[in-house]
Amino acid sequence: MLKDITLGQYFPGNSLVHRLDPRTKLLLMSAYIVAVFIVGNMWLFALVAAYVIGVTAIAGVPVSYLWRSLKPLRFILIFMFVINLLVTATGDTLFEWWIIKITTGGLRQAVYISLRLILLVSGTSLMTLTTTPIALTDGLERLLSPFAMIGFPAHELAMMMTIALRFIPTLIEEADKITKAQTARGADFETGSLIDRAKAMVTILVPLFVSAFRRADELAMAMESRCYHGGEGRTRMTVLKYTKNDLEAALSMALLIGIIITVQAVT
């Protein structure tokens, strides 16, 4: 299951989506999140899903990568679906037994919440799969640079977020190695009660924390040895420029949001 987490991983390519300016991707992702949250019917959910699938096809990223990003969330999806199904009690009653009451409003809310989570995870995974951590750092720093005039640490924040993203696949790989090593020594993580399995996880978490601190220390030493002292006075190898492709991508997102708002207003 750990290998199924795609957040922070990069899928190499030279597609139109890969070549977009990272600032454009970050802005479009913000607009996409807004679009997902204002969607209010199944036809619009299908439209947003088709948009994501279309962008995935243009990027040349296998759909299996998006499916892998959703697999670790299956228990959260089930939990959220059940909670919303049982808590929301609006509309007509579909089923009622003892204190359990399922209504049309509850079913609609449960489906909508689950679809929103699926679309959000798919969209964010697609952005990280088509953008290198360095490009994300550069794009985020450029977007936040106007706030540096009032003392906002734009470069430092961008660097922290990039390091965090870069460490996700590294820690996942490390956790997988530790799990296999402990399993070879006789550790059992699949059977037993919930408490027994939680205790068994300690044999993974302790070495993982030790490894994380060691890697963080090594990274700090490497940055210091290269005379890194923040963003002040630093130059950039790559100069970011908006292109025609960025404009077309922005127009496609504007069209999507325009359709959503129009349909929502009419229905």
Model-predicted segments: where are they?
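Loop-to-transmembrane-helix entry motif
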Residues: S69-L73, L77, S114, I118-V121, ...
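Juxtamembrane/interface alpha-helical elements of multi-pass membrane proteins
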Residues: L73-A187
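Transmembrane alpha-helix interface motif
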Residues: M1-M42, V48-A57, R142-S145, M149-F152, ...
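Membrane-helix interfacial "entry" motifs
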Residues: N14, F37, G60-Y65, W97, ...
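Alpha-helical transmembrane segments and their membrane-interface exit regions
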Residues: Y51-V61, I76-F79
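Transmembrane helix-loop junctions in multipass membrane proteins, especially transporters and channels
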Residues: N41, F45, G60-S64, T88-E96, ...
